[in-house]
Amino acid sequence: MVQAWYMDSDTTTDQREEHQLDPPVPVSIDEVRDKSGVLYWKLNADTYEQDGELEKIRKDRGYSYTDVIEISRDKLPNYEDKIKTFFQEHLHSDEEIRFILAGSGYFDVRDCEDKWIRIQVTRGDLLVLPAGIYHRFTLDKQNYIKAMRLFVGEPVWTPINRPADEHPARFQYIESLRQGIMV
């Protein structure tokens, strides 16, 4: 099952470490949803092409395009630059949807009080980060992840670095959190 926790503020330690508070403060996936709007499903990464679960989610949410990304030193061109870009706090004007096929890593998301929640993703986890949420991604100590990226329409992956509080997607996100209507 997915694990999440509030993060420490130590910026001197390797970003690939867990960065748990002392004592740890776990966050359930329901709390993650309620505090950030992030959605989660656990799928079978071995049978998703046959069992229909991913296809149903795609149909229900309008995800019409997919591709696969592998992140490791030997698989991703310009690895160091990409890792820095992924870990820079940013938002997107569209949802960010990732289905983990292999490996593991961390999505850090800001909760409704602007605190970091670290979500550990592993094989079979499907996350939907809402448009307008401040977030970042890093590998863990395994230094490898393979993920399916899902999009509504043609793929757009344009990070809008913080501060971006005036961006329309941010306004809409904040309003959705206030009204409790994240879907």
UniProtKB/Swiss-Prot annotation:
GO terms for molecular function: acireductone dioxygenase (Ni2+-requiring) activity; acireductone dioxygenase [iron(II)-requiring] activity; iron ion binding; nickel cation binding. Residues 1-21 are annotated as: Disordered. Binds either 1 Fe or Ni cation per monomer. Iron-binding promotes an acireductone dioxygenase reaction producing 2-keto-4-methylthiobutyrate, while nickel-binding promotes an acireductone dioxygenase reaction producing 3-(methylsulfanyl)propanoate. Fe(2+) binds at H90, H92, E96, H135. Pathway: Amino-acid biosynthesis; L-methionine biosynthesis via salvage pathway; L-methionine from S-methyl-5-thio-alpha-D-ribose 1-phosphate: step 5/6. Pfam families: ARD (PF03079). Ni(2+) binds at H90, H92, E96, H135. It catalyses: 1,2-dihydroxy-5-(methylsulfanyl)pent-1-en-3-one + O2 = 4-methylsulfanyl-2-oxobutanoate + formate + 2 H(+); 1,2-dihydroxy-5-(methylsulfanyl)pent-1-en-3-one + O2 = 3-(methylsulfanyl)propanoate + CO + formate + 2 H(+). The keyword Cytoplasm applies. The keyword Protein transport does not apply. Its EC number is 1.13.11.54, 1.13.11.53. GO terms for cellular component: cytoplasm; nucleus. One of its GO terms (biological process) is methionine metabolic process. Its cofactor is Fe(2+); Ni(2+). Keywords: Amino-acid biosynthesis, Cytoplasm, Dioxygenase, Iron, Metal-binding, Methionine biosynthesis, Nickel, Nucleus, Oxidoreductase. It is found in: Cytoplasm; Nucleus. Catalyzes 2 different reactions between oxygen and the acireductone 1,2-dihydroxy-3-keto-5-methylthiopentene (DHK-MTPene) depending upon the metal bound in the active site. Fe-containing acireductone dioxygenase (Fe-ARD) produces formate and 2-keto-4-methylthiobutyrate (KMTB), the alpha-ketoacid precursor of methionine in the methionine recycle pathway. Ni-containing acireductone dioxygenase (Ni-ARD) produces methylthiopropionate, carbon monoxide and formate, and does not lie on the methionine recycle pathway. Belongs to the acireductone dioxygenase (ARD) family. This is Acireductone dioxygenase. The lineage of its organism: Eukaryota, Metazoa, Ecdysozoa, Arthropoda, Chelicerata.
